[in-house]
Structure formats: structure tokens, C-alpha cells
């Protein structure tokens, strides 16, 4: 083992695509003989993971995990929905979501985290690729914090507990009763999952990207001018349409899907009276499987997934 350097382990990993721990073991089993180590990995069926990593991972699962005032949601892709139903894959995804709690949501950070088996998340996924026979990748992750308070979750059409095609986290910041907050948070998470009347882009008006708001304002103004309206009327029309726009995309302004007569903001105000403490939304995340990936030619999609998950 004395002749086995970190550089040699890295070289073997680069050639085979196998995790660092397995590469180190292969070199140890072959007394540091590089080519023999490659053959050893091939015989173990591990080096095939490198070729599989080039294949498209379009399916998979979105998983959520919460712990008091912290929560995380991750998307792990696989090639087929058949693998998404595989117990080993689901167990791995569940652990990855749990490991993401308390972090920043950075994919590279999560990949470097240690699993219960002692390997890193990245190496564990590489081993699963070889074991299950399909490419898979941790594509993205996000976290929500509400302290004091709770982070509630909801998974739409779950494939297993806390994982499915759409995962939502909602942080409710308050000193109120945690059980009541959790119940309210889950209902709001269900609202966010529904995306009605549109998928919310921010908690409040100030959180809407100024570029998006400016573009909408410009479009509304052009429409009014093309209708021959004078400038004094144009401005009033634009303001009215912007209010409608915010009612569609700002969470607090949206009509609550379970009680359309009240907005989310009004629901929170009522909850605050019931709890005897203010209730605010610290943040929310809605993650849908495959969202934001352009499904063009297969090689382009594979590149997008690889880029999003930090793979080279």
C-alpha cells in the first residue's frame, strides 16, 4: 500500500469512473499495479459505471426531508421510471435528502457528504450505477429554514414516503404551536404544488425578479397603447394588470386553493390570531422532476443534466 499515492487513485478513478474508495481498494488488492487494478474493477463490474454515466438520466425522484425548522428537497435522476421504483435507489435518494438538511443546497457539497455506509454520496451513486445498471445523478437541491418555526413538506403522487414527481417545502416562521404550524404549512405546501392560478415565483411582491416585472409592465403598456389609449389611461391600465399579475405569481397574493375566498396572506393573518403569534413565510421551494431541462436531442439533454448536477 505504500506505493499507492493519491495521484494514482485519482488516475484510476478518471479512467474508470469508479468511486475513490473502490479505486483505492482495487489498487490495494493488486499491489498498486494500475492495469491490474483496472481489470480487477472490470471483473467486479464497477468500471462499467463510467460508460453508463454517459447515458441520459431523464426520470428519477424528487425527495423531501424536514427536521423542525429546517428542510431540504433534492432531485436525483435515473434513466427510467422502473429504477425510480427500485428500493435501493429510493433508499439512496431518501438519505441524500436527509444529508442535505442544514446545508446550503449546493450539489457539490452534498456529493462530498458521507453516507451511512461510509462512502461519499458521489461514490455511493457511482456504485449504484454499476449495481442497478443505469445512469443516475444528483441534479439539484434546495433548502428552507424557518427558525423559530417549522418547515412543512408535501409530495404530490408519491412513489414512496416523502418522494415522488413534485416536492414542496414551506417555511412558517412563528413562535406559535408547532403542530398547528405544521398542519397549516402542509396545506400551503399543497397549494404551492397545485400551482394555481400559476406556479408562485416569490413569497411577496418585492421578491419578484425586477427584470420579469419590468418586462410584464412593458408588455401591458404596449398593449394599451396599441389599443389607442391616452397615456393617462395607459398608466392606470398597467397598474391594474400588474396587480392581476402579482395575484397570479406572488404566493401571498394568490387565492388559497382550499379556500378561494381568501388569499394566502389572509390565511396567515387568521392563523396568527388563532396562534396568538405572528406567522410569516420564510421561504418555499417547489421542485418538479425534470423541470427546467430542455428535452431536445438526447445528447443535449444529457449535457444539461450533467451540467446541472456538476458533472464534467
Curated annotation (Swiss-Prot):
HAMAP family xref list: EF_Ts
Function text: Associates with the EF-Tu.GDP complex and induces the exchange of GDP to GTP. It remains bound to the aminoacyl-tRNA.EF-Tu.GTP complex up to the GTP hydrolysis stage on the ribosome.
| UniProt family annotation | Belongs to the EF-Ts family.
Query: Where's it found, cell-wise?
Result: Cytoplasm
Q: Where are the annotated segments for Involved in Mg(2+) ion dislocation from EF-Tu?
A: 80-83
PROSITE patterns (UniProt xref): EF_TS_1 (PS01126), EF_TS_2 (PS01127)
UniProtKB keywords: Cytoplasm, Elongation factor, Protein biosynthesis
Show the GO cellular component annotation of the record: cytoplasm
Q: Which residues form a coiled coil?
A: none
**Name of the protein:** Elongation factor Ts
Please list the GO terms describing molecular function. translation elongation factor activity
Q: Which organism is it from?
A: Maricaulis maris (strain MCS10) (Caulobacter maris)
Which CDD domains would you find in this protein's record? UBA_EF-Ts
Q: Do you know which NCBIfam families this protein is assigned to?
A: tsf
Quote the InterPro entries the UniProt record gives: EF-Ts_dimer_sf (IPR036402), Transl_elong_EFTs/EF1B (IPR001816), Transl_elong_EFTs/EF1B_dimer (IPR014039), Transl_elong_Ts_CS (IPR018101), UBA-like_sf (IPR009060)
Amino acid at each position: 500500500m505504500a506505493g499507492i499515492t493519491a495521484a494514482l487513485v485519482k488516475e484510476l478513478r478518471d479512467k474508470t469512473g469508479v468511486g475513490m474508495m473502490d479505486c483505492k481498494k482495487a489498487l490495494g488488492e493488486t499491489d498498486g499495479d494500475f492495469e491490474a487494478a483496472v481489470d480487477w474493477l472490470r471483473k467486479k463490474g464497477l468500471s462499467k459505471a463510467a460508460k453508463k454515466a454517459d447515458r441520459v438520466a431523464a426520470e428519477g425522484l424528487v425527495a423531501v426531508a424536514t427536521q423542525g425548522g429546517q428542510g431540504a428537497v433534492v432531485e436525483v435522476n435515473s434513466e427510467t421510471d422502473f429504477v425510480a421504483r427500485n428500493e435501493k435507489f429510493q433508499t439512496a435518494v431518501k438519505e441524500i435528502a436527509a444529508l442535505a438538511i442544514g446545508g446550503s443546497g449546493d450539489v457539490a457539497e452534498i456529493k462530498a457528504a458521507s453516507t451511512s455506509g461510509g462512502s461519499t454520496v458521489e461514490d455511493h451513486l457511482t456504485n449504484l450505477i454499476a449495481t442497478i445498471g443505469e445512469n443516475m445523478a444528483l441534479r439539484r437541491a434546495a433548502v428552507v429554514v424557518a427558525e423559530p418555526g417549522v418547515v412543512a413538506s408535501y409530495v404530490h403522487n408519491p412513489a414512496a414516503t416523502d418522494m415522488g414527481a413534485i416536492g414542496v417545502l414551506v417555511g412558517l416562521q412563528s413562535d406559535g404551536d408547532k403542530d398547528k404550524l405544521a398542519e397549516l404549512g402542509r396545506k400551503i405546501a399543497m397549494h404551492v404544488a397545485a400551482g394555481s392560478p400559476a406556479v408562485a415565483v416569490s413569497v411577496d411582491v418585492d421578491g419578484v425578479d425586477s427584470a420579469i416585472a419590468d418586462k410584464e409592465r412593458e408588455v401591458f403598456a404596449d398593449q394599451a397603447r396599441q389599443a389607442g389609449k391616452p397615456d393617462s389611461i395607459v398608466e392606470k391600465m398597467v397598474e391594474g394588470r400588474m396587480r392581476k399579475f402579482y395575484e397570479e405569481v406572488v404566493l401571498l397574493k394568490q387565492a388559497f386553493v382550499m379556500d378561494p375566498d381568501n388569499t394566502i396572506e389572509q390565511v396567515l393573518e387568521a392563523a396568527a390570531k388563532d396562534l396568538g403569534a405572528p406567522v410569516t413565510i420564510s421561504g418555499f421551494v417547489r421542485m418538479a422532476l425534470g423541470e427546467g431541462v430542455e428535452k431536445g436531442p438526447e445528447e443535449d439533454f444529457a449535457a444539461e443534466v450533467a451540467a446541472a448536477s456538476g458533472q464534467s
